[in-house]
Amino acid sequence: MKNNRITKIINQYEYKIFYKRIAFTILILLIYILGSKITIVDENAMRQHDSAFYKLAVSNMGGDIHQLNVFSLGLGPWLTAMIIISLITYKNMEKAMHQTRAEKHYKEKFLTLGLSIIQGYFVINQFVRHTDAKRFTELLLLLILVTGAMLMMWLADQNMRYGIAGPMPIVLLSVIKSMFTQSLPIVSIEILMLVVMVILIIVALFILLLTELIEYRIHYRDIIEMPTPGQPTYLAWKINPGGSISIMISLSVFLLLTSTINLIFNMVTGKTPHLQWLSFGHYMGVTIYLILQTVLGYLLSRLIVNTKQNTKDFLKNGNYFIGIRPGADTGNYLNHLAKRLCWFGTTIVTAIIGVPLYISLLVPDLSEYIYFAVQLMIMVYLAMNITETMRTYLYFDKYGAFLNQYW
């Protein structure tokens, strides 16, 4: 009798699925913490040079090169592979939707493996001192780094299926860890300058919060349900559909570009290159990154908005916009609105990230503090996305008992 009563209470508890997902995500994070503690190279064997930009970028993808460990490459190769495959299949979305999960995973894993090898080779050549057994040591370290990257991809994928927010909790933990391990230099700053910096950070965070919360609503007519005056039907898009994932992907692609150019230079000359112009310490490097952030942020936003699918759904359901013919005209109308919205949201995020990076070039003494501020903004952005995902799970948990009757 007592057991039946306990079972009834558990079955009626509306958040049980949500808490299972939280528990699974915590398990994934514990595995990530354990793997990041397994160092594969002694600290004395690491090259100490100015690589703040690379450490910043890697930490925002779940990696860590302060000390080379199993998960040093992070999720960068996987995120890059996903965006490349998504952009390739964008023109033929119907064919991509008919692919099985196994087919999609095979393509992602194969491309991730290749990108991991390129980035891993770059990390070893740039940040590890070479020994007499150079070739054997490089191959062994490369094997460990690539294996760790593939394991991280699997952990993030499992968290996407059974946990909360996919790769974002791993990246958030990596950013927090990186912020606490940074040793900021002591710089004498005037009180006025400090107040201005704090105000600018608060304003930037407030703008990011607005882009995450504000929706762009397009009202339409539903031929099945007549809208009430207080509850009109509308299609809702976020101001920045790409969210924080666009920042992670742009950093990943930028690192892939850096790694590829360094790899080609090393294969041609046989020397370890130091391409300062392709870093956050040079105007060219910052400009290239911001161009990548703008283009990839826009493309990712367009993928998420998916006006092609919206057009098909409207045509199938009989919904329409006033003064717009169904079919091709509706598609052109939605594409026009989506272009303006996605460019607007992407430009805001790029400006918020770009302005501090350019200021760090003008005031090099404050570069470490500016990188710290950028990480703080990215951390808050990730936290907002994770919170929104948790709210979505809570919303569906409330109707779980009803939906399970039909699933």
Swiss-Prot record:
Entry membrane topology: Multi-pass membrane protein
InterPro entries the record matches: SecY/SEC61-alpha, SecY2, SecY_dom_sf
Subcellular location: Cell membrane
GO cellular component: plasma membrane
UniProt KW DNA damage keyword: no
SUPFAM superfamilies cross-referenced by the UniProt entry: Preprotein translocase SecY subunit
Classification via Pfam families: SecY
Transmembrane regions: 22-42, 68-88, 108-128, 136-156, 169-189, 191-211, 245-265, 280-300, 343-363, 366-386
Presence of keyword tRNA processing: no
Main location: membrane
Keywords: Cell membrane, Membrane, Protein transport, Translocation, Transmembrane, Transmembrane helix, Transport
Family: Belongs to the SecY/SEC61-alpha family. SecY2 subfamily.
Record function comment: Part of the accessory SecA2/SecY2 system specifically required for export of possible cell wall proteins. The central subunit of a protein translocation channel.
Oligomeric and partner information: Component of the accessory SecA2/SecY2 protein translocase complex required to export cell wall proteins. May form heterotrimers with SecE and SecG subunits.
The protein's name in its UniProt record: Accessory Sec system protein translocase subunit SecY2
Organism in which the protein naturally occurs: Staphylococcus pseudintermedius (strain ED99)
